[in-house]
A protein has these predicted regions:
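Transmembrane signal-anchor helices characteristic of membrane glycosylation enzymes that use polyprenol
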Residues: 25-51, 59-63, 69-71, 170-178
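Residues at helix-coil transition
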Residues: 15, 65-67, 117
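Extracytoplasmic catalytic/substrate-binding loops of multi-pass membrane glycan-assembly enzymes
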Residues: 48-60, 69-86, 97-111, 192-193
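Loop-to-helix entry region of an early transmembrane alpha helix in multi-pass inner-membrane enzymes
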Residues: 99-110, 118-151, 184-192
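Start-transfer (signal-anchor) and selected internal transmembrane alpha helices
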Residues: 1-43, 138, 158-167
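Transmembrane-helix signature of polytopic, membrane-embedded enzymes
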Residues: 28-32, 121-129, 148-177, 195
Length: 195
């Protein structure tokens, strides 16, 4: 099977754009993007919630699901005590801490957050939203969303331009832009999710 896929891949590698590309070759091209991305997770991935933006993205998820509110006082206090948050601004209307970041990443992280919560429930980790299972889960979510984005973009580029231009473009975009950094080294930022 793998030998046939490899043969189809080579046969279809230099087909001109718009040609009918074999599905096996297309799948093999996807594997050449997705598998290295997954392997790099083992070497580069650093799951942690840090920095003003990363903390401000994550507190939506933690506060909404565990506190059932959007009062970030306890979350911001927790991160400030650990030196991960520098400044809190108070909203003049509500008197509560404001959040300068959007909630989009938290919405995308929600299934992963609940997976982390499940792991925390069945292991000795704290179920407070700050322990390792939560952090690892949402950071894995960012990396997996970015990998899914790479796979979708690969499919579109293969269909539109052919396999070789698609792979060259994907590797240039992935390795030549900050995407690699935000996928693996700073996954609490929104950039990996928004790719």
């Amino acid at each position: 099977m793998l030998v046939q896929s490899w043969k189809n891949f080579i046969d279809n590698l230099l087909l001109p754009p718009g040609s009918l590309i074999d599905k096996g070759a297309h799948r093999f091209a996807l594997c050449l993007v997705v598998l290295p991305a997954l392997v790099l997770m083992f070497f580069l991935w650093k799951p942690w919630i840090h920095g003003n933006d990363g903390v401000r993205h994550y507190v939506y998820c933690r506060s909404a699901w565990l506190d059932l509110d959007f009062n970030f006082t306890n979350e911001f206090s927790w991160y400030m005590a650990r030196g991960e948050l520098q400044k809190i601004t108070i909203d003049q209307v509500t008197g509560l801490p404001g959040n300068s970041q959007g909630c989009g990443s938290a919405v995308l992280w929600s299934p992963f957050f609940w997976l982390g919560h499940l792991v925390a429930l069945i292991t000795p980790y704290a179920t407070n939203g700050y322990s390792a299972p939560y952090v690892w889960a949402v950071c894995a979510g960012t990396s997996l969303y970015a990998i899914a984005g790479l796979a979708l973009l690969t499919s579109v580029l293969v269909w539109r331009f052919g396999i070789l231009p698609a792979l060259l473009s994907i590797y240039a975009i992935w390795l030549g832009s900050p995407l690699l950094f935000y996928m693996y080294l700073h996954p609490s930022m929104s950039h990996g999710c928004s790719f």
